[in-house]
Amino acid sequence: MEGIHSRTDFDLGNHQKFSGKKIQYFDPELGENYVPYVVETSIGVDRMFLAVLSNSYKEEQLENGESRVVLSIPAPLAPVKVAVLPLVKKDGLPELAREIMDDLKYDFNCQYDEKDSIGKRYRRQDAIGTPFCVTIDHDSINDRCVTIRHRDSMQQERVKIEDLHAIISKEVNLSNILKKLN
């Protein structure tokens, strides 16, 4: 995204006027002197990020009448890639959640959250654009599977803990966006 401003001869004309120095160009083909026009261009990453953020912000009405704020930022651009959420703060779930967090945190920016109900935690993560929430429940201890929730669709699927890294890597890889540009 770029800003382009045609300043005409305003800037150089005023500089010439107040400095007392001629800032003119002689065109030999036309045989005329004139003050050149200035075209000011401005480009920056900040404009791109503003466009992505503006386009990603959504307020959705859910079937149950509630609403949710979602920052549907593309997964490769999301600052936080995954949230690890034990269903409750007891029965060994936080310990397993911390193990999973320890496995993921070196490759992905992760958040750990055990405060409030699971629904409120999902909403908090939706609002900051976290593409994936991993929920550890009582079955996780025995079957070594967790529930991964996708932010945009709110769909949940049961996956093996050992497959989490590969699933998240595939989705947050920047090459996914780059391939769409071709």
Placement of each model-derived feature along the sequence:
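NTP/phosphate- and nucleic-acid-binding module
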Residues: 1-182
